[in-house]
Amino acid sequence: MNPDLRKERASATFNPELITHILDGSPENTRRRREIENLILNDPDFQHEDYNFLTRSQRYEVAVKKSATMVKKMREYGISDPEEIMWFKKLYLANFVEPVGLNYSMFIPTLLNQGTTAQQEKWMRPSQELQIIGTYAQTEMGHGTHLRGLETTATYDPKTQEFILNSPTVTSIKWWPGGLGKTSNHAIVLAQLITQGECYGLHAFVVPIREIGTHKPLPGITVGDIGPKFGYEEMDNGYLKMDNYRIPRENMLMKYAQVKPDGTYVKPLSNKLTYGTMVFVRSFLVGNAAQSLSKACTIAIRYSAVRRQSEIKQSEPEPQILDFQTQQYKLFPLLATAYAFHFVGRYMKETYLRINESIGQGDLSELPELHALTAGLKAFTTWTANAGIEECRMACGGHGYSHSSGIPNIYVTFTPACTFEGENTVMMLQTARFLMKIYDQVRSGKLVGGMVSYLNDLPSQRIQPQQVAVWPTMVDINSLEGLTEAYKLRAARLVEIAAKNLQTHVSHRKSKEVAWNLTSVDLVRASEAHCHYVVVKVFSDKLPKIQDKAVQAVLRNLCLLYSLYGISQKGGDFLEGSIITGAQLSQVNARILELLTLIRPNAVALVDAFDFKDMTLGSVLGRYDGNVYENLFEWAKKSPLNKTEVHESYHKHLKPLQSKL
């Protein structure tokens, strides 16, 4: 054990195990998660290849092998609970992306959300056992987030009771679905439904694409891999082109919308019900943002405690770089953000499950807010985490650029989350559309609930966006209640500014669509402020529920840092709205520096509480034992370029050149 890390852990003011229990949901969850992890670590069949030294084809093969072995092992161990499956995958796959992942994360959830009982009986078991390997084919070469623009067609033929699927243009070719290129034999395809001469918009169809047994593409199907990408090298993101490809009528998922044998269309109770899979995945991505940022913080903070560099006082030993205030200012707000996102991720998961249960009973009242909140928080958390992961890499100096640090892989694996499952700016605008509807309802005298209830204060003119918001007392920068109120006022103010600017453009005889575009920057700002308020509120609401006083104190410091750092970064919004004064902003910045000092003794213990195994981190710099330099040298020796003392290229190219000089 590195002596600096040993000292760091000894200096902590709390027991990290107690925070681990909170993050896992309970001590029992922690016990069970570790039990599952130990099954993997003690299994002789488990092998962990260093993906950094593999070709793309090798990475894909290893990932497929891992996926197949993982399914067999989960059956062997009797692991079927969704949360336990997630724990198993995280350690078993380590830092590999799973080619069969969309079978479990999108194909099966879509069957559950949109399939009839008969359809679930037909396809669920085979897909759970990987007889059917499914993917989710929505995105096309020419359209992604703009679902109404998708061009793939499914035309119903009542004579044969079949749908005829076509990719009518080059831009209509399905493009990007994970596992589509080489792995999947089925896809849930989103296509424009045409029956009796009318187009009824996007619907989901279960489409066999490869023959089971031979795995060859079926007639009418053209399918393959889209090529190398920024990351995800072991994932076979693919393309799919369909030419007059016929599937039975029963392959349309018909839990909500239906097509009768004669071609009659029966519309769903709500069009938004078909977006269930997207909402599910977006709610999951919030938690994934927390996980990825937590990994990067763990690596950067542990390494910063081990790395010694430069000097603070002359003639004294080189200090740990974690002692530099600038390093703390880079990393501790990100650590606070990781914790904030953990809590909001759990909140979103619980909210999704609760509302989904209500939807199953026919209550759709909370669906619009769920759709808006998952879209906005998906964008807010992934943007923030993406930038934070890169900040952690740079905080590791030159070694952070090496794949040995683990952070480059975390970054390239996470960064597509900013554009898949909904491009983030478009997601923010979807949230804004909901906020504008709520704003109109409030202005007409209706009281609203949920996370937008703060807009109920608008008619009383307590918030005056173009002038001064009435602030009854000075903001107490040590009061989480007061800081939450400040974020609430900022959100309300920016929502009202966007709404009034939108109305101004409409009153100038602009169409609603043109007015929306001309207001879109304000609308995104309003959505961002709303999401920021939700995160602050969820984090601060969590603290009173924590029993242990030492744990509560350290998490309170993180919550204060998260809230104050956000005010510092968005100071213009708070100043323009007269929510805080210039003098208070100076106090905020001073208090942030005080909090860095308070958090410093607990920094390593706070990342230890995430309880990542070294295998999951995949980092030489972030090792639990802190023995960085010895292992960095050993890691470098594994490079394929080191297999020979003299590379063959020397004899082929350099030696002939040198002999002529």
Curated annotation (Swiss-Prot):
Keyword annotations for this protein, in alphabetical order, are: Acetylation, FAD, Fatty acid metabolism, Flavoprotein, Lipid metabolism, Oxidoreductase, Peroxisome, Phosphoprotein
Q: Which InterPro entries match?
A: ACO, ACOX_C_alpha1, Acyl-CoA_ox_N, Acyl-CoA_Oxase/DH_mid-dom, Acyl-CoA_Oxase/DH_mid-dom_sf, Acyl-CoA_oxidase, Acyl-CoA_oxidase_C, AcylCo_DH-like_C
In its UniProt record, a GO molecular function of this protein is: flavin adenine dinucleotide binding
Q: Which residues carry this modification: N6-succinyllysine?
A: K89, K90, K159, K241, K349, K437, K446, K512, K542, K637, K643, K655
Needed co-factor(s): FAD
Q: What is its EC number?
A: 1.3.3.6
Indicate the transmembrane segments per the record: none
Pfam families, per this entry? ACOX (PF01756), ACOX_C_alpha1 (PF22924), Acyl-CoA_dh_M (PF02770), Acyl-CoA_ox_N (PF14749)
Q: What family does the entry list?
A: Belongs to the acyl-CoA oxidase family.
Q: What is this protein called?
A: Peroxisomal acyl-coenzyme A oxidase 1
